[in-house]
């Protein structure tokens, strides 16, 4: 079912690719005094891609506590199907990790599959 909606979800053309971190989560964001952003670490998956790719991890771990997704969307906006794209990106990332490691972590994969189902139902 997910692939049947792929063309709808990714129908909005990406204006331009930008350099993304590829694994942007709260553990890879450096914050200094006064809560100022000082840098990013662990850029092993950096690439030029859709700028929204990095957003899928903003709600992982403790990201929701820091309102990262909401802050980003307020400052930069989001595509029409951003939530559905993020569900795809999150699921793809876990499949990619599985391919690289051979380890499937149900604790991570199950919520991603459920989220994908919820996002598809919104279409």
Model segments located where?
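A structural signal for well-ordered alpha-helical scaffolds and beta->alpha junctions
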Residues: 3, 65-69, 88, 109, ...
